[in-house]
Amino acid sequence: MNMGQAKSYSVIVIGGGHAGTEAALSSARMGVCTLLISHNIETLGQMSCNPAIGGIGKGHLVKEIDAMGGIMARAIDKSGIQFRTLNASKGPAVRATRAQADRILYKAQIRYTLENQDNLSLFQQAVDDLIIEHDQIKGVVTQMGLAFMADKVILTSGTFLGGVIHIGQRNFQGGRAGDAPSNALSGKLRSYDLRVSRLKTGTPPRLDNRTLNYSLMQVQPGDTPLPTFSFMGVKEDHPRQIPCYITHTNEKTHDLIRDGLKDSPMFTGNIEGISPRYCPSIEDKVVRFSERDSHQIFVEPEGLTTNEVYPNGVSTSLSYEVQLNFIRSIKGFEKAHIIRPGYAIEYDFFDPRGLKQTLEVKKISGLYFAGQINGTTGYEEAAAQGLLAGVNAACAILERDAWLPKRNESYIGVMVDDLITKGANEPYRMFTSRAEYRLLLREDNADERLTPKARDLGLISEVCWQSFQVKYEAITQEKNRLKNTWIQASDTQAGVVLNQNLNHEYSLLELLKRPKIDYQILSQIESGKPFLTDATLINSIENQIKYAGYIKRQLEEIEKYRKNENTILSVNIDYDSIKALSSEVRQKLELHKPETIGQASRIQGVTPASISILLVYLKTYQSK
């Protein structure tokens, strides 16, 4: 280790994936001298699995990252080749944006942003060791023995820690196909008293677009008009749009897969890591859902300038021979050529209950974990954690209060609270169902919830802040106009538009509250003009007005809960001494060491009665 020439930074980020890039950018945007170290600069922002961003719950995270000044939304707006709004016919809480990405364009956008960010330097080299003295991080050591010193280090290792790739009975070490694992760093972390386990994820074989018969498949076009991810985005940012396609497995496919299970590492015991529940391999689906005679496959192009296609829905670790046979049994894939075989990968992750709310490791001061190392799965979940870790590392350097988003403020807050309170016994994926207050945490109001905080932290530009102010001033003015514009009962034209006679005068706001009346219908009423034309503003206004009653109720629930939510629990509490608690609850509180009453209440098995006992104990404890 060459300490004599060691260069110092305030924050070092290890890893250039989705967590690492957001961590490095957020730290640097706050004015902190930051170094991003990646084993390969060419893979910054690489999409290792599916070429897509967003989806249910995930799209909400992307909007929140954007509201906090992150790059993911802007990058996908400039690289997305198909955009769709999922759950468009359902309520606003569960509507979500999803975009198919051109991998090459996406990666280029990320790298360009990193290379042009003030206060941020890049360095290519694998990190093999951490410099830790008296349980305090001091820096890192690269593969060639170079030392870089820093007060804060953020580890975003993805699937690289102890990574092992499986294809049939063959397995070999790797962080992903074509990349070496981080075994030395994994060994270093395992030497500390951190709870470590193994998880598994997988990816499907990539196919040659020229060998597929799309005439046998169902076309899946994108939405019109095109949505955007970034609040600063415009449709003109999007590159050329192209369709995806849909096909299905069949009984022959399933028979071939069943016959190949004898060589499947998942079913022979070679893989011990736990798989993602909501993204199972095709062999897992065939076994678990044996009554089904087909499974849907989304045929997704990987870009505008490549022939590679991603068959979403057939992730597999079966042998190459079995992969080729079952792929060619699928309609439209009869002559398919596999460019890259599918594989499964096992890797180390560390129990996120060993983290503070800031994502700092409790046992090693100054070290932060973000991304799959914490047991999550998905680009969006990783990026959100990276953003949070980067902000909090910078806050610590600047001696500012940490950013601790709450469950009622953001999906980022929901995710982090779930992780540090409940842990992850399987790869954690974000869904809207995980949020108690999801009507407050819509995609359309992510900027309203978070951009003022981003402004306070120094994460956004003046242009972004001014755009935000203009938007919400327009929304406020229009809501006031709707409230104060009255339609008379004698207005026959309004009656025709509304398809009902008015028995007395109504404000436009009152009319908009009705289930079958939307803003577009109201805009046809001559006496109510002028109306807005911006679809984004209209959507926000409709959601605020139509769901005002439900929103008010959720806010009241939050206020009741808030009284005790943030009550601090000292790390020195001896839970074994609180005999009024059951032994099970005492053990769980001792294991998890929750920082607040709110966290304690979300530990599985900790009942409301247990929380009441804790509150009584705290009052007694504080009075001594």
Swiss-Prot record:
Protein name: tRNA uridine 5-carboxymethylaminomethyl modification enzyme MnmG
GO cellular component: cytosol
Gene3D superfamilies in the record: FAD/NAD(P)-binding domain (3.50.50.60), GidA associated domain, C-terminal subdomain (1.10.150.570), tRNA uridine 5-carboxymethylaminomethyl modification enzyme MnmG/GidA (1.10.10.1800)
Family: Belongs to the MnmG family.
GO biological process: tRNA methylation; tRNA wobble uridine modification
Cellular compartments annotated: Cytoplasm
Domain of life according to the entry: Bacteria
Gene Ontology MF, one: flavin adenine dinucleotide binding
InterPro entries assigned to the protein according to its UniProt record, in alphabetical order: FAD/NAD-bd_sf, GIDA_C_N, MnmG, MnmG-rel, MnmG-rel_CS, MnmG_C, MnmG_C_subdom, MnmG_C_subdom_sf
Protein residues bound to NAD(+): 275-289
NCBIfam families named in the record: mnmG_gidA (TIGR00136)
Signal peptide bounds: none
PROSITE patterns (UniProt xref): GIDA_1, GIDA_2
Subunit architecture: Homodimer. Heterotetramer of two MnmE and two MnmG subunits.
Named cofactor requirement(s): FAD
SMART domains: GIDA_assoc_3
Pfam families associated with the record: GIDA (PF01134), GIDA_C_1st (PF21680), SAM_GIDA_C (PF13932)
UniProt keyword terms in alphabetical order: Cytoplasm, FAD, Flavoprotein, NAD, tRNA processing
Amino acids binding FAD: 15-20, 127, 182, 372
Origin species: Ruthia magnifica subsp. Calyptogena magnifica
